[in-house]
Amino acid sequence: MRDESEDARSARLLAPVREALARFEQETTVPVLAGPWLGEVGFELLYWIPFLRWVVSEFPGLRRQLVIQSRGGVESWYEGLVTRYVDLFTHVTLREFRERFGKFFKQTDTYDGYTQAAGGRDYSEAEQAIIEIVRREVGAERLNVLHPSVMYGAFKHIQGSPERAFAAYFPELTRPPVSGFGLELPEQFIAVRFYECFPLPASEANQAFVRELVTVLADTLPIVCLNTPMSIDRKHPDFPIDRIESVVTVQQSMTLANNLAVQSAIIGQANAFVGSYGGLSYLPPLYRRPSFSLYSDGRSLSKTNHLALAQSVLGKPKLGSYWVGSIEGMTPRAVADAVLAS
């Protein structure tokens, strides 16, 4: 295969995936579970959902068969894909989730290592439990399973498609309505969520920077803090935000089953989003909202393709702006000026 072209190699490596998807499409009466999905928000927005959009573009019949499973009320993220959506958080408590499914949060730093073929795996006990929850909810005798491991193995080859074609898998989303959550939002505001992660550790210096940044921003526009009342992912606790004037909290409107739905609705209405570099920062551009995310430790960013991919597709003219910067050598005032000028 020494002389094999990149296109030929991608086609060869995608062949088992296509064969499995074609089999699923032929079984028209059997629902296809897209999942079990319990990965991080960033992987869902940047990889999983675009992969599913590729799937239905290549196999249109699967659109009618897909059953989307996720958590936190993110059905709107799958706009144009979903006819049936099952939210795990309507079936389990937070304690049950941690005890039974917490290990699902572990992700790889890069999707290059995943080569699992469709239909070729034994499911863990936790995965089997989720598959059974979905099967019962949709009332099916059995499900075909489109497992995320298929996406990790195939995505790098899908990403090799022409840039314009690949960007089509990141369409503009309809901004979700804020009605129904009991929210009282300012007419104009900035949505803020900072949480601990590898790029932005919760050091004293970083927390001080964030506190000053929020204070400076709040002098001009109200701040809506997206911190959640429950610690769903203990690896990424929220930075505390001072309860100062012009800072609005929305924890009273959040439940386990709707926390991401609430955050999505608020981000869609915000003048801008400001937060840690990571998963949630990928969402605002899909609503044509500017996103500003910060990091202090760039070492983790250099090990993956995530940032390069986000910058290449989320800053497209049809979407909102996507800005990522290091707080090293910057001042809170400089960041605030950039946000307020957007």
Identify the residue ranges that each predicted region occupies.
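Membrane-proximal basic amphipathic "stem/tether" segments
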Residues: 1-20
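Active-site and donor-binding regions of nucleotide-sugar-utilizing enzymes
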Residues: 18-24, 30-136, 262-265, 280-283, ...
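Structural motif
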Residues: 30-33, 189, 272
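Catalytic donor nucleotide-activated moiety binding site of glycosyltransferases and closely related
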Residues: 71, 187, 192-197, 208-259
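Active-site regions of enzymes building and remodeling cell-envelope glycoconjugates
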Residues: 78-95, 237-254, 289-291, 308-326
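A nucleotide-sugar donor-handling region in carbohydrate enzymes
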Residues: 113-195
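Acidic donor-binding loop of glycosyltransferase active sites
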Residues: 268-274
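Nucleotide-sugar donor-binding patch of glycosyltransferase catalytic domains
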Residues: 281-342
